[in-house]
C-alpha cells in the first residue's frame, strides 16, 4: 500500500515501547512517503531509522496514493496553510484519506466543510502586497501560505530593510560613538548581499532595489514555499538573485564573498537558529563586511551575536532593535 504522510515530523513517526525504548511507530506499514515543506524536517526524517522515505517540495507529490494521512491543527500550522494542503490532497484523489487533527472538534469540522461544501472550487491562496523603504520604489511581493508573515509586511523585516538601505545608500560611516571601524562602501562594486531566512524576499529585494550600484543577491531559506516565492519575486522584479534551499547556511565555496549579511532569525529554540544565522554570517562575510540582524528585544540576541562579532551596535527602528557588527 502506498501511503503519503502530510504534516508529520520525525517525532510523530516513533513511539516508546514498554521498556522505554524508542522505535518506529507500529502503524508505519507498506510503502510510506513523508512530505515536508521544510528541508530541516526532511533531513531529520532521512537521518532517522523509521524506514520512511522523505520528500521536500512546495507542493504535494503527485501519484496513485492508496492513503493520505494529514496531521494539522491550530498549534501546528496556520488555518490557511491547512486549507491549502487539504485542497492539494483533495486534488490528488487518494483512495482513502485520514485526518489527524490536534484541536477542537468544531475547528476540525469547520476545516473539512470548506472543501466538502464546494469540492470543485480550486482556490488560489497566494497573495500580493506592497512594500517599500523611504525614498525607494514600491515593490509588489508575492507570498504563499507557509511563508513567514504571509499576507502582510513583517515590521521587524521592514525595520531591518530600512536601516540597511539607508546606511548603504548614504555610504555613511558608523556612528562616531561606536568603536566599530568605518565601512567604506565606495569600494564595493557590486554590493554582495546575503539574505538568510529570506522568506518571500522582503528584506533582500528592498535593500537591492534601494541601491544605484549593481547588487549580487543571494537568498537562503529552509522552507520550500519561501524559496518558491523568492524565486518568483526575483523573476517578476527583474532582480538577479540566487535563491538556495538550505537549513545550514551557505555552501563553503561562498565563504568570505559577501559585503553585507541581513537576517531576521527566529526567536524560539533558545536562539539555536540564531546561532546558525550568525555562524553563517561570520563565515560568509569578507573582512570588513557588515552583519545586520533584527529582533524585538536585543537582550536575547545580542549575547549570541557577540559570540561571533565582539562589537555590536544597536539601532532602534519601528520598535525593533537592529544589531550591527563588522567582521574583523
Model feature map: region roles:
Residues 284, 291-328:
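C-terminal catalytic and target-recognition region of SAM-dependent MTase-like enzymes
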Residues 67-79, 196-204, 258-270:
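Conserved proline-anchored active-site loop of SAM-dependent methyltransferases
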Residues 93-97, 214-215, 289:
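A short helix->loop->beta-strand "cap" motif at the edges of active sites that frequently abuts
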Residues 109-171:
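SAM-dependent Rossmann-like transferase core, predominantly class I methyltransferases
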Residues 75, 80-87, 91-135:
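N-terminal auxiliary segments of SAM/dcSAM-dependent transferases
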Residues 103-104, 267-268, 296-300:
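Short "lid" loop at the C-terminus of a central beta-strand within the Rossmann-like core
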Residues 83-94, 275-287:
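A short glycine-rich, Lys/Arg-flanked "PGG" loop and its adjoining helix->strand segment in the class I
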Residues 1-53, 155-174, 188-263:
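Conserved SAM/SAH cofactor-binding pocket of Class I
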Amino acid at each position: 500500500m502506498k501511503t503519503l504522510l502530510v504534516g508529520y515530523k520525525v517525532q510523530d513517526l516513533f513511539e516508546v515501547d514498554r521498556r522505554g525504548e524508542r522505535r518506529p511507530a507500529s502503524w508505519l506499514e507498506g510503502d510510506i512517503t513523508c512530505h515536508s515543506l521544510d528541508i530541516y524536517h526532511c533531513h531529520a526524517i532521512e537521518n532517522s531509522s523509521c524506514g520512511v522515505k522523505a520528500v521536500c517540495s512546495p507542493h504535494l507529490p503527485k501519484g496513485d496514493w492508496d492513503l493520505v494521512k494529514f496531521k494539522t491543527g491550530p498549534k501546528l500550522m496556520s488555518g490557511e496553510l491547512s486549507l491549502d494542503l487539504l485542497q492539494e490532497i483533495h486534488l490528488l484523489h487518494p483512495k482513502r484519506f485520514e485526518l489527524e487533527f490536534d484541536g477542537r472538534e468544531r475547528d476540525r469540522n469547520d476545516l473539512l466543510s470548506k472543501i466538502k461544501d464546494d469540492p470543485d472550487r480550486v482556490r488560489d491562496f497566494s497573495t500580493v502586497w506592497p512594500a517599500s523603504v523611504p525614498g525607494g520604489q514600491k515593490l509588489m511581493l508575492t507570498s504563499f501560505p507557509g511563508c513567514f508573515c504571509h499576507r502582510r509586511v513583517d515590521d521587524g523585516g521592514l525595520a531591518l530593510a530600512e536601516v540597511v538601505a539607508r546606511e548603504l545608500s548614504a555610504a555613511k560611516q558608523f556612528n562616531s560613538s561606536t568603536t566599530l571601524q568605518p565601512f567604506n562602501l565606495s569600494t564595493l562594486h557590486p554590493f554582495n548581499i546575503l539574505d538568510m531566512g529570506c522568506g518571500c524576499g522582503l528584506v533582500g529585494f528592498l535593500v537591492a532595489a534601494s541601491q544605484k550600484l549593481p547588487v549580487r543577491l543571494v537568498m537562503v531559506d529552509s522552507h520550500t514555499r519561501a524559496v518558491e516565492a523568492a524565486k518568483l519575486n526575483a523573476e517578476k522584479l527583474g532582480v538577479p538573485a540566487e535563491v538556495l534551499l538550505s537549513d545550514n547556511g551557505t555552501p563553503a565555496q561562498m565563504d568570505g564573498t559577501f559585503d553585507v549579511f541581513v537576517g531576521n532569525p527566529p526567536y524560539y529554540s533558545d536562539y539555536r537558529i540564531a546561532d546558525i544565522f550568525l555562524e553563517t554570517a561570520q563565515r560568509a562575510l569578507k573582512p570588513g563586511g557588515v552583519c545586520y540582524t533584527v529582533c524585538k528585544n536585543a537582550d536575547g540576541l545580542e549575547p549570541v551575536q557577540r559570540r561571533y562579532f565582539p562589537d555590536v551596535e544597536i539601532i532602534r527602528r519601528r520598535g525593533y532593535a537592529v544589531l550591527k557588527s563588522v567582521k574583523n
